[in-house]
Amino acid sequence: MGLFTTRQLLGYTEQKVKFRALFLELFFRRTVNFHTEEVMLDKITGKTPVAAYVSPIVEGKVLRHRGGETRVLRPGYVKPKHEFNYQQAVERLPGEDPAQLNDPAYRRLRIITDNLKQEEQAIVQVEEMQAVNAVLYGKYTMEGDQFDTVEVDFGRSEGNNIEQADGKKWSEQDRDTFDPTHDIDLYCDQASGLVNIAIMDGTVWRLLNGFKLFREKLDTRRGSNSQLETAVKDLGAVVSFKGYYGDLAIVVAKTSYVAEDGTEKRYLPEGTLVLGNTAAEGIRCYGAIQDAQALSEGVVASSRYPKHWLTVGDPAREFTMTQSAPLMVLPDPDEFVVVQVK
């Protein structure tokens, strides 16, 4: 038995709960929802058919010889869930004024909405992790409820992942005389299209900004474009636009996620430089919602299905859960070049 309608819950999560994720906002702006559990990769671009190489992962090892190319892929199903209990509504909430205590009914609503926020954030974290790894490596590991873990590989060319060798390491160069422009141009040439943005972690930024000739060419007066401003909105504390290096927008990212062990980790490994284009055609694909209640309500092809219900018993129990079947697709992984800067 649910106390809130699906329309109310969807309206709340769509309008009130917005977790912006950098790579999703920049490179995966299009969304395609499917009425089937499987995502049809060859139907999402309208151009060249997209295929992915899918390999099983057993005990942490990718068994590529047991994999194969496919154009039909079933996403992992994620459904973060919370239980609300009566004791939570009786106790004072964090930040609540002891002199003006709220009634339990208000606390209950606040806790339920907070639970929905946490569920949305958990799903966005899964989506952003897929997006980041697709950009960094051209592939990612897909997991889900009652789902065999697999590696989804979109076929990145080896030359698009570069590691600076001895003699070429930026950390070995003279800060007053070295000009990184030639290196950056060579890296950009590996991309299948034009490059207009460089995303890096703080380590790479400190190295680059340490070069006198880089600082002289960096244009900090020209404002960022509207697309970039939208992507970094609400991310000001962890994403910084530094300026333009020629036509290249320079962005420093310190975005992070919460790992399974509860620790906070950065999406970008230390020393990572990502070169790409904000016109990249990454696609957020979603398989059908696999819930009988959703089907009865006509909610099948959707990126989210939040629900709230009570179970009758002694005592009764109350739950929230948000379901999704995300699959981030990068049709052309060679649009990006990733450099391990040393």
Say what each PLM segment does.
Residues G60, D145, G262-T263:
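Intrinsic-disorder/low-complexity loop/linker signature
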Residues V78-R156, D179-D183, Y187-V204, A316-Q323:
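Long, contiguous amphipathic alpha-helices that act as assembly "spine/axial" helices in icosahedral shell
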Residues N161-T177, H182-D183:
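Glycine- and small hydrophobic-enriched segments that form the cores of compact globular domains
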